[in-house]
């Protein structure tokens, strides 16, 4: 072979050029081809604000593994890429950029701001795509989409209008999660709950007597974590079955400070066992109170402005921040004698996942999706197995959300995003939902309209991603061929945001499931198990890892040991281990190529392996590999990607490199038998090429470079055929025989290590056994056994003829192996060495015992130091025992 690999593996030298080659040759591209079976997956579109992080790296590596695997299996594999406009995240980022330039969003106006936003998107929006390419992602970049491109915009408008026509979308006043910093509503899924130390304020409201006077002795007591919301109270509720309060139902209380009369109502929502069994009802600021208020026709009094200051309904507290108002109200209640006590209390507080501001439940006019009917097909699909969630335990999380679903608030008070296609008649206020600006008001005939200023929740457009990217609402050939998709790979943290919404959108718009399987992965945490975050400063930049170790090392690290749905810890040591594995493959490949001289340049095709003189070692490795192909393929088909690559890793490192290559070296170096050498080289090359194919989805760059250097028949490993299991390549007898030989070799190596035998020092090996299977294996593999065991000769016998007392022995399986002691070591030199070691250990033991028996040391030294010295005592004692035992043997 005239061409060989560079002496050392350098990822920087190969990765960029190989990726360019793949793109130039359109290996990632998929077109409709009815002669092939399609396999489709859509990329969870990363935000255009995004920079590649470890979560992206894991998510896209998993997808790339699946798409490369299916491509090699002959599927017409499409991985649909794209980016998300990320409404609120992008708007916040652009506002920050403008602030640095001294520009205020509102000074620009909506159109001016959107111009800046598109400029920003053009400059920075594609950054993460270039970073994904560095990872090796084999997406069809010719099909790259954006959630606000023309096609997606059309799909969003069509869905909104269709759902409004069906009554699924409506505008109404309901409780929403309001972010007072971002000044927008957010969905339940965008609220993060974190435990915070707070208080329960125990307050009492006085009873209004039948004559209208306010009682000074009769009160109803309750507790609240948000005393400022009392300004919006419109009732106090008790459970209808609570005997303590039955006489008070229908009575009136006086709301202190505000001096508003509140009815005492009965509602089963109230838990009699919690606190005093009394709940104040604030319909405009609590979702549960809102529902109670609807049942009892209570007024809804909003006390907050959009920035969470008190509005005019708060009377004298108007203009105060919510927390300042809280303090002032509590102070006044205390002065009035109506504050019973303050109790420390830890509770979950909802915060906006973007800006971490405490959200305010607030009644607002918003657009909603009615979920009660829409969600039913999504529930049934998972229940009946039409859509499979992996791991299965994710079903519990899925159903927990669907069982407690609320109507989805889809309007956002933002400018960047899909503007809601609703138009208000300037004359009569009639709302017209339409695919384009209406010409005439159907109610009054006016021709002037103003479009709703709000935009849609980012996840509204993302929910359409599996079919909008294929051309819907047009019935394109792509849509007919590639939809429904096969698998969705995503993090478990967006099951609510995205997965469920895609499922019900798929059934509602397409009448079928959007995908067959959802493969969930966990989070990538730091080595201590902590979530990576800016505040902790523990984030790890995958691009830095790629720059230092190569993309393949990062990919292998992220997948090895990874199980669906489980979080993983990231260790730099594991990346180094992955890099070492790459070096191992590289060096093994170079070794094989160096032995393929012009006389022995083995072609990849044109040789009938059945005609080769395969030795026992050849048949063993071929049989082991054949079994590996079946197991790995089964694992891949079951989405056990971490298990699959661990098996490939173990096979290449252990069976192929550490054992088989060592087994065939005598045949390569010393054999004059051309046919024997040809069989060895063919086996080496064949197994390596096919092992590279199994590894390719995980480590695409190094496998491509070696594959294309090792053979010339195929232009790229990524479009080569995935190996298939063949029963003809099962060699059970030879496989078992080599395993017996390996066990015997391990025993011999252990003895040599204990005796400190110099590497390469040869000695006679006597194997005493009456086990015919072992004898046959050693006969068939005598050359292999002798080489691996450093045996000058191998003597097989059934009895102890010729065995002397000065031989060392080891019992392995059904055999005893003997080696002449004098052939292994120079006894005098070994005794001298061990006597020196005995003296050194004696000194160490004296020192450690002295410290541990020293009262001052034991009382003042840190616990860790004392523990360290105790560990040394155990270690040195064990070493001394071994040295003494060895000396006793030698002196005999």
Regions found by a protein language model. Give the residues of each.
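Short, solvent-exposed turn/loop segments enriched in Gly/Ser/Thr/Pro and often Arg
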Residues: 34-36, 44-45, 80-91, 144-152, ...
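Non-catalytic terminal extensions that flank enzyme cores
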Residues: 1-54, 77, 340-343, 353, ...
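Short conserved beta-strand and strand-loop elements enriched in small hydrophobics
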Residues: 203-205, 250-257
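Alpha-helical support elements that line or immediately flank enzyme active sites
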Residues: 56-58, 287-292, 501-509, 648
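N-terminal catalytic cores of NTP/NDP-binding nucleotidyl/phosphoryl-transfer enzymes
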Residues: 31-94, 147, 156, 222-224, ...
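Residue patterns forming the tRNA-binding/recognition surfaces of aminoacyl-tRNA synthetases
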Residues: 3, 17, 21-25, 95-215, ...
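Secondary-structure transition/capping motifs at alpha-helix termini
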Residues: 68-76, 97-110, 130, 134-139, ...
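Feature 926 captures the class I aminoacyl-tRNA synthetase adenylation module centered on the KMSKS loop
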Residues: 202, 400-460, 464, 508-551, ...
């Amino acid at each position: 072979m005239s061409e060989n690999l560079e002496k050392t593996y350098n990822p920087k030298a190969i990765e960029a050029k190989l990726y360019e080659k793949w793109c130039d040759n359109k290996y990632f591209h998929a077109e409709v081809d009815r002669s092939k079976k399609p396999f489709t997956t859509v990329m969870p579109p990363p935000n255009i604000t995004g920079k590649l992080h470890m979560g992206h790296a894991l998510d896209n590596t998993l997808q790339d593994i699946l798409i490369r695997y299916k491509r090699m299996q002959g599927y017409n594999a499409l991985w649909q890429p794209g980016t998300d406009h990320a409404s609120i995240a992008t708007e916040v980022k652009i506002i920050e950029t403008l602030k640095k330039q001294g520009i205020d969003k509102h000074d620009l106006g909506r159109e001016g701001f959107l111009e800046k936003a598109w400029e920003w998107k053009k400059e920075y929006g594609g950054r993460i795509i270039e970073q994904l390419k560095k990872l090796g992602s084999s997406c069809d970049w010719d099909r790259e989409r954006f959630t606000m491109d023309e096609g997606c915009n059309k799909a969003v408008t069509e869905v909104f209008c269709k759902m409004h026509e069906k009554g699924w979308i409506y505008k109404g006043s309901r409780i929403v999660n309001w972010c007072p910093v971002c000044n927008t509503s957010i969905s339940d899924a965008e609220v993060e709950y974190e435990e915070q130390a707070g208080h329960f304020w125990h307050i009492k409201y006085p009873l209004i007597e039948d004559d209208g006077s306010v009682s000074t002795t009769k009160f109803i007591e309750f507790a609240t974590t948000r005393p400022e919301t009392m300004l919006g109270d419109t009732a106090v509720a008790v459970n209808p079955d609570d005997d303590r309060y039955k006489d008070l139902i229908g009575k009136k209380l006086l709301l202190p400070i505000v001096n508003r009369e509140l009815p005492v109502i009965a509602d089963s929502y109230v838990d009699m066992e919690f606190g005093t069994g009394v709940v104040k009802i604030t319909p405009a600021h609590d979702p549960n109170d809102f529902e109670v208020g609807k049942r009892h026709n209570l007024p809804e009094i909003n006390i907050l402005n959009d920035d969470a200051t008190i509005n005019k309904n708060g009377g004298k507290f108007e203009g105060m921040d919510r927390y300042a108002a809280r303090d002032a109200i509590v102070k006044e209640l205390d002065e009035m004698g109506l504050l019973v006590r303050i109790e420390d209390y830890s509770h979950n507080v909802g915060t906006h996942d973007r800006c971490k501001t405490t959200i305010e439940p607030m009644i607002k006019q918003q657009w909603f999706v009615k979920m009660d009917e829409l969600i039913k097909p999504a529930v049934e699909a998972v229940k009946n197995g039409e859509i499979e969630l992996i791991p299965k335990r994710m079903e519990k999380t899925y159903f927990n959300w669907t069982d407690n679903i609320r109507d989805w608030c889809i309007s956002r008070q933002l400018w960047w995003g899909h503007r809601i296609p609703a138009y208000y008649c300037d004359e009569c206020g009639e709302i017209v939902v339409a695919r384009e600006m209406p010409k005439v008001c159907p109610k009054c005939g006016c021709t002037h309209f103003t479009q709703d200023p709000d935009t849609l929740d980012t996840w509204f457009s993302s929910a359409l991603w599996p079919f909008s990217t294929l051309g819907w609402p047009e019935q394109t050939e792509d849509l007919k061929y590639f939809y429904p998709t096969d698998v969705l790979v995503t993090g478990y943290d967006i099951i609510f945001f995205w997965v469920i919404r895609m499922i019900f959108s798929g059934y509602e718009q397409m009448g079928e499931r959007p995908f067959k399987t959802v493969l969930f992965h966990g989070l990538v945490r730091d080595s201590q198990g902590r979530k990576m975050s800016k505040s902790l400063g523990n984030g790890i930049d995958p691009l830095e890892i790629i720059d230092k170790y190569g993309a393949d090392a990062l990919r292998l690290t992220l997948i090895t040991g990874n199980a669906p749905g489980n979080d993983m810890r990231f260790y730099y040591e594991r990346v180094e281990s992955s890099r070492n594995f790459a070096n191992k493959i590289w060096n093994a490949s170079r070794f094989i190529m160096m032995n393929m001289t012009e006389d022995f340049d083995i072609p990849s095709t044109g040789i009938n392996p059945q005609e080769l003189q395969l030795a026992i070692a050849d048949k063993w490795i071929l049989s082991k590999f054949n079994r590996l192909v079946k197991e790995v393929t089964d694992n891949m088909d079951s989405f056990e990607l971490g298990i699959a690559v661990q098996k490939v890793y173990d096979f290449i490192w252990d069976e192929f490199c550490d054992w088989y290559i060592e087994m065939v070296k005598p045949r390569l170096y010393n054999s004059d038998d051309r046919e024997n050498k040809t069989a060895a080289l063919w086996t080496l090359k064949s197994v390596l090429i096919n092992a590279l194919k199994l590894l390719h989805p995980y480590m695409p760059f190094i496998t491509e470079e070696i594959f294309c250097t090792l053979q010339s028949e195929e232009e790229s490993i990524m479009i080569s055929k995935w190996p298939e299991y063949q029963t003809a390549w099962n060699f059970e007898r030879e496989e078992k025989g080599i395993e017996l030989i390996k066990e015997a070799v391990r025993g011999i190596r252990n003895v040599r290590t204990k005796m400190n035998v110099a590497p390469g020092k040869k000695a006679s090996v006597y194997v005493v056994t009456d086990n015919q299977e072992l004898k046959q294996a050693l006969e068939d593999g005598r050359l292999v056994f002798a080489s691996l065991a450093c045996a000058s000769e191998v003597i097989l016998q059934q009895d102890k003829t010729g065995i002397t007392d000065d031989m060392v022995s080891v019992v392995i399986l059904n055999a005893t192996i003997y080696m002449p002691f004098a052939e292994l070591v120079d006894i005098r030199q070994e005794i001298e060495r061990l006597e020196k070691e005995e003296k050194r250990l004696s000194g160490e033991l004296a020192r450690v015992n002295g410290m541990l028996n020293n009262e001052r040391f034991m009382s003042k030294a840190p616990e860790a130091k004392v523990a360290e010295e105790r560990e040394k005592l155990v270690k040195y004692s064990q070493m001394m025992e071994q040295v003494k035992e060895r000396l006793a043997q030698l002196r005999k």
